[in-house]
Amino acid sequence: ITGNKTKTKIKEAYKKVLTHKKAMGYILSVSFAFSGMFIFIEKSSFIYMEYFNVSAKLFPLFFGSNVLMMIILTKVNMKLVQNINPSKILYSGVVLQVISAVFLLLFSFNANIYTIFISMIFYVGSLGFIFGNAMALALEYFKEDSGVANSVIGVTEFKIAGVIGFL
């Protein structure tokens, strides 16, 4: 928040952000994606090392492959946004994440390391299309209140991640 905004103006700014349907859609999309990342960070060692008996020596390769895919898709995103509307790229990222989540769910009933690994790579990798685009699209509506909007994004990300992680 810049300048000396009064409490009333601050409340108005928060209300403006929280009631903006399009912006909240972007905020929720980045928040649910953020939750998926938290769950991956929290559960991946159990899934790979305990469930699939991946050694402690090999686990960093499995974990790092997911991060590498996210980096690759972030770099691809940087090129794509020069010519393609960020909302279309975001949509593609969300679709990729949902498809990957469905495969994870389906494969979990008859899990093998290969199907889970490939599904996880695309699930985590999709964040490269989601994070930057959803943030930019949400903040686009709040040029004067970008600090407030950014704080709403941060709080929403952690609240949703906390609730989903707890479940």
Where are these regions (language model features)?
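Helix-to-loop junctions at the C-terminal end of transmembrane segments
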Residues: 72-87
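Small-residue hotspots at the loop-to-helix junctions and early N-terminal turns
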Residues: 53-64, 151
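Juxtamembrane intracellular "pre-TM" segments in multi-pass secondary transporters
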Residues: 1-27
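A late C-terminal transmembrane helix in Major Facilitator Superfamily
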Residues: 125-128, 135-167
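Transmembrane alpha-helical segments of major facilitator superfamily
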Residues: 61-70, 157
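Short amphipathic helix-loop junctions that connect adjacent transmembrane helices
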Residues: 42-57
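Pair of pore-lining "gating" transmembrane helices in MFS-fold secondary transporters
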Residues: 18-39, 121-125
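C-terminal transmembrane helical hairpin of 12-TM major facilitator-type secondary transporters
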Residues: 87-134
